[in-house]
């Protein structure tokens, strides 16, 4: 693997649980038809709130080379490494590739169609992460002739309209708030009592008692406040900054464990919560894979690689829904999974193989069958094939993969039902969310109304032009075309 690596003493490895052993064989006659990845953004600077919740860490906050909350130079390199790994694994001209699936350029075979589609969560650190992957996947020299670089377009939504990556921040906000309030009254006090010593130490280090965080200007709830402070110390470590005076490595690790336990238990303790945390991404993933499950795929006139970029919460939620267990050695654990390295990437390979004679007898009209092969990679660990615990085999049949998600949602109801969300229809006050809807809506104008608007615009334009000519002549100026 090229690019960013830790020193050998700090190299972390994936535990064996959930990973496929090297000597386990798989069908070698399958073909890759579509590739989907979901990546966590890279290392970032702490959230703004820590300026008031830990004023004694000001020296470290001032040392960051980027604005607070944004991707650091280390985070950018981590995601560039993701792109380089994808290039090494799937690019046609790479010597150690596993499969010749992607062209050397974004522009595809004979410049017929972009091969890769990038979509990011509304947060800028997610879109920057997507851009950094593009740098690694399409380095200088792979752009169109005459322009060495390859700009990669990133699709994004406003956060209030982002239902596939951030439903809890939009239509599910009130549902989330209700669940968080219940957690704060039940489980959170139990955990805080267990970690009382480290929380008291945190208050002394930062100069603000944990219980006072909600009362500060621009403060937040205590659980989220502890999470943001734990993140701050971890980000400081990743940036190579010194420990804040009074903080110890042991206390930082305990704080990180508390924050991760809170995150997992208050977001994913029930199937219902998992459903709305995944939100519309489950539909996006299923549709993206299903559209590639045809014998003519991948066509030169369509995308073949879909690169999605979000927060750790989406990866954890999807993992819980699918039975994808994360086990990174040395990281905090809760609900039988570990936390994630920055840049952790989930790979979904849609593959096709010829039917066996027995399968052909049962499905006379079908020519091939489809399955999903899953891998995991991070800037700190090697590529590992993952078996979903909810699937019967490692190479999960596409129908069974779909059923894992649909069965989960059938138990809980859709995220829209859980969050009491009703998709706006054209004619309501809400603006349409897609370009197609906008175009369709514009077609609804009556011909006379359109002509009236154009007529008024022409009259106003002529009047303004006449006024400018008159004014110029009064001032002795000559009009310039």
Each language-model region and where it sits:
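Residues that act as N-cap/strand-start positions at coil-to-secondary-structure junctions
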Residues: 1-4, 342
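Cleavable N-terminal signal peptides of Sec/SRP-targeted secreted and luminal proteins
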Residues: 4-22
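Signature for phosphate-centric chemistry
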Residues: 23-117, 121-306, 310-472, 477-481
């Amino acid at each position: 693997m090229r690019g960013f690596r830790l020193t050998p003493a700090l190299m972390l490895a994936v535990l064996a649980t959930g990973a496929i052993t090297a000597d386990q064989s798989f069908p070698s006659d399958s073909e890759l038809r579509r590739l989907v990845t979901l990546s966590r953004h890279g290392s970032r600077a702490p959230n703004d709130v820590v300026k008031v919740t830990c004023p004694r860490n000001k020296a470290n906050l001032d040392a960051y080379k980027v604005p607070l909350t944004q991707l650091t130079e280390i985070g950018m390199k981590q995601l560039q490494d993701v792109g380089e790994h994808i290039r090494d694994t799937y690019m046609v001209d790479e010597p150690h590739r596993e499969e010749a699936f992607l062209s050397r350029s974004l522009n595809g075979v004979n410049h017929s169609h972009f091969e890769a589609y990038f979509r990011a969560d509304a947060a800028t650190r997610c879109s920057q992460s997507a851009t950094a992957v593009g740098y690694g996947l399409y380095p200088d020299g792979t752009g169109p002739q005459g322009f060495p670089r390859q700009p990669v377009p990133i699709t994004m939504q406003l956060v209030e309209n982002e239902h596939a990556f951030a439903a809890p921040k939009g239509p599910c906000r009130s549902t989330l708030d209700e669940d968080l309030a219940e957690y704060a009254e039940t489980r959170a006090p139990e955990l805080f009592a267990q970690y009382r010593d480290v929380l008291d130490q945190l208050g002394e280090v930062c100069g603000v008692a944990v219980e006072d965080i909600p009362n500060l200007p621009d403060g937040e709830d205590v659980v989220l406040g502890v999470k943001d402070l734990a993140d701050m110390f971890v980000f400081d470590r990743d940036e190579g900054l010194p420990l804040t005076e009074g903080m110890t490595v042991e206390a930082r690790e305990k704080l990180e464990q508390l924050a991760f336990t809170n995150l997992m238990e208050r977001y994913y303790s029930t199937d219902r919560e998992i459903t709305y945390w995944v939100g519309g991404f489950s539909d996006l993933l299923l549709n993206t894979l299903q559209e590639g499950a045809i014998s003519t795929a991948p066509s030169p006139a369509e995308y073949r690689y879909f690169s999605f970029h979000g927060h750790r919460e989406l990866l954890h939620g999807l993992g819980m829904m699918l039975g994808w267990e994360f086990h990174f050695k040395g990281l905090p654990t809760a609900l039988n999974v570990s936390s994630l390295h920055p840049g952790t990437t989930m790979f979904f390979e849609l593959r096709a193989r010829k039917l066996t004679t027995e399968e052909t007898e049962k499905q006379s009209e079908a020519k091939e069958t489809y399955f999903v092969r899953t891998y995991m990679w991070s800037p700190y660990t090697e590529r590992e094939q993952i078996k979903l615990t909810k699937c019967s085999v490692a190479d999960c049949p596409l129908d069974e993969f779909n059923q894992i998600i649909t069965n989960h949602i059938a138990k809980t109801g859709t995220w829209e039902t859980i969050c009491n969300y009703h998709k706006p229809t054209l004619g309501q006050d809400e603006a349409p969310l897609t370009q197609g809807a906008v175009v369709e809506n514009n077609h609804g104008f009556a011909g006379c109304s359109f002509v009236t608007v154009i007529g008024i615009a022409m009259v106003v334009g002529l009047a303004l032009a006449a006024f400018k000519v008159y004014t110029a002549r009064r001032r002795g100026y000559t009009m310039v075309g």
